[in-house]
């Protein structure tokens, strides 16, 4: 049912085996990640949640649940902290470390998908390289 739903939504190159997506056989593409991210970024509630280092939700029974975002670009105490990064998602399976970020700078938004980094820290180094390239490009104009 889940994969039928994904295909009906236009995510034709994504196959999941459980709702978490945490299965070494799960597949997706940068194109599908871009599509789902772009769709979700249309929702302000999504932007609010993914841009925070911690998020507390009130559950239907009135209790609360707090989640810690593992994207260290959002962590004020991290060497990788960047106030212009506004989310979105970390992920890792086996030895592949992935990161999808929304970067806001120069009055524009940049959606960056970095897949297959070799370590947790290298995913941030890889994206930082892209962010610095954006800065160099805009500063040379």
Pin down the residues of each PLM region:
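Penicillin-recognizing serine hydrolase domain
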Residues: 1-141
């Amino acid at each position: 049912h889940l994969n039928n739903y994904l295909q009906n939504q236009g995510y034709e190159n994504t196959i999941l085996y459980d709702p978490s997506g945490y299965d070494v056989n799960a597949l997706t593409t940068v194109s599908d990640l871009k599509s789902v991210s772009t769709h979700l970024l249309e929702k302000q509630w999504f932007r609010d949640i993914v841009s925070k280092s911690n998020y507390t939700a009130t559950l239907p029974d009135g209790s609360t649940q707090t989640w810690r975002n593992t994207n260290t670009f959002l962590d004020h105490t991290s060497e990788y902290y960047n106030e212009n990064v506004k989310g979105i998602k970390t992920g890792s399976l086996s030895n592949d470390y992935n990161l999808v970020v929304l970067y806001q700078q120069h009055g524009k938004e940049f959606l960056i998908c970095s897949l297959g980094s070799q370590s947790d820290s290298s995913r941030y180094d890889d994206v930082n390289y892209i962010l610095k390239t954006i800065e160099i490009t805009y500063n040379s104009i």
